[in-house]
Amino acid sequence: MSRRGNIKRKPVPPDPIYNSCLLNMTIRRVMKSGKKSVAAGIVYDAMTMIKERTGEEPLEVFERAMKNLTPLVEVKARRVGGATYQVPMEVRPARGTTLALRWLIRYSRIRGGRSMASKLANEIMDAANETGAAMKKRDETHRMADANKAFAHYRY
């Protein structure tokens, strides 16, 4: 592990169409093999589908989905005297956003459907309505933290 100080994170520039940093982070996460234009097409198609299906502003639906998916607590393994405990820890906002995006895209990819854009749109709409596989993962993470509340005093 590095003994140097914390690195400064570069600010993520907003995307050109919706002017949202969160959407640009999503495009970067969807991207495979450096094909950013393909990833942007997928994300923007998904946003168009959300607008058609819900009639709401797609960015609002997306932000609501991200707010719902962001975990408040998670468990981290901590070794104490030969035993490993799952210690519940609060999640920093940046990590919470990263986890929410990771889960959203992972469960979009394994979801059934024709195109990645439609799978992503469906997962975003489900998350906005507090259903779907990504929400299930968030709830499971919260349950794990709740079950291991007894080890909270091992925080570091």
UniProtKB/Swiss-Prot annotation:
Keyword tRNA-binding applies: yes
Q: Name one GO molecular function term.
A: structural constituent of ribosome
Task: Alphabetically list the UniProt keywords.
Answer: Ribonucleoprotein, Ribosomal protein, RNA-binding, rRNA-binding, tRNA-binding
Which InterPro entries does this chain map to?
A: Ribosomal_uS7, Ribosomal_uS7_bac/org-type, Ribosomal_uS7_CS, Ribosomal_uS7_dom, Ribosomal_uS7_dom_sf
Q: In its keyword annotation, does this UniProt entry include RNA-binding? A: yes
| PROSITE patterns (alphabetical) | RIBOSOMAL_S7
What does this protein do, in the record's words? Answer: One of the primary rRNA binding proteins, it binds directly to 16S rRNA where it nucleates assembly of the head domain of the 30S subunit. Is located at the subunit interface close to the decoding center, probably blocks exit of the E-site tRNA.
What binding partners and quaternary form does the record give?
A: Part of the 30S ribosomal subunit. Contacts proteins S9 and S11.
User: Which protein are we looking at?
Assistant: Small ribosomal subunit protein uS7
